[in-house]
């Protein structure tokens, strides 16, 4: 049995804060990050009020530091229009749904070639992806549907296979009909090691998700928000291409807000999320901090000021 470094019992709880967070936010200086944090909160609140998209790009660490319950609560409150995942985020969420645990010890597993070789993750994710491809679905919807079907098949049984559905973004978004897109790099994700991995299915489903994502990005015009949280390479590159596709097809895409949240400000998020897409009109915001502190603080501010 593979050992995991993260358990669902360690996950964050949705904010149930009373008065206090708003006062804290109001007390922040109107300088640098204090000003930027307020701007991010204001942009998200404004987008929801206008009915504009609030798209959350999520890297793997956001899931494995226990923030799914916070994001699911924001889904329920209308602050998440779509979830945009890289491959790692999808893997961690899939494992949490099934086992309530994720994040293996790479140092211990790699010497014997056991890293990324968990049978259940590899087999079931690839089955879900192949089924999605056969039905003309994207990867995000396909993974959510697969997990939800497992929930239904094993409902009421002592050996239910999806014991942690409440902590899964894939399942909760699927149930709420909130789009999830998954953007992978072939060979970068552990399920690609498995004998059931089908490059055509992986590429086909992720490509459909890119098309869906581009259609969502188109709607950011005039008031939408795109947040990149914890993806340093894949999602910033995908977002930049989606922006270019939308504009190439003649659609207006200006006066929207982008937010990058990470514990370091890397080159690609800084350029491809914060700066370049908003050069022709819009606002790019960079917030630096640990996900497990910064994202719950942002969520609490949204809830209290809603």
Ranges and model annotations:
Residues 212-215, 222-225, 232-306:
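C-terminal functional extensions of proteins
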């Amino acid at each position: 049995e593979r050992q995991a470094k993260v358990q669902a019992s360690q996950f964050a709880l949705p904010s149930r804060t009373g008065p206090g967070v708003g006062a804290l936010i109001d007390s922040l200086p109107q300088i640098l990050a204090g000003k930027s944090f307020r701007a991010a909160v204001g942009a998200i609140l404004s987008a929801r009020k206008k009915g504009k998209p609030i798209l959350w790009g999520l890297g793997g660490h956001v899931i494995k530091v226990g923030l799914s319950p916070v994001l699911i609560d924001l889904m329920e409150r209308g602050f998440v229009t779509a979830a945009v995942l890289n491959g790692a985020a999808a893997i961690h969420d899939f494992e949490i749904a099934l086992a309530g645990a994720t994040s293996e010890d790479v140092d211990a597993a790699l010497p014997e070639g056991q890293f990324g070789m968990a049978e259940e993750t590899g087999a079931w994710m690839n089955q879900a992806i192949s089924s999605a491809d056969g039905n003309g679905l994207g990867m995000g919807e396909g993974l959510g549907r697969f997990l939800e079907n497992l929930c239904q098949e094993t409902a009421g049984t002592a050996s239910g296979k999806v014991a942690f559905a409440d902590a899964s973004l894939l399942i909760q978004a699927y149930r709420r009909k909130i789009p999830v897109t998954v953007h992978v790099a072939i060979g970068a994700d552990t399920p690609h090691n498995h004998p059931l991995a089908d490059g055509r299915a992986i590429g086909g489903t992720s490509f459909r998700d890119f098309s869906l994502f581009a259609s969502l990005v188109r709607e950011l015009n005039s008031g939408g928000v795109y947040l990149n949280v914890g993806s340093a390479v894949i999602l910033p590159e995908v977002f930049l291409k989606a922006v270019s596709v939308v504009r190439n097809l003649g659609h207006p895409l200006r006066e929207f807000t982008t937010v990058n949240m990470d514990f370091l400000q890397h080159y690609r998020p800084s350029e491809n999320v914060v700066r370049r897409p908003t050069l022709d009109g819009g606002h790019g915001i960079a917030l630096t901090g640990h996900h497990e502190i910064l994202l719950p603080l942002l969520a609490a501010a949204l809830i209290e000021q809603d």
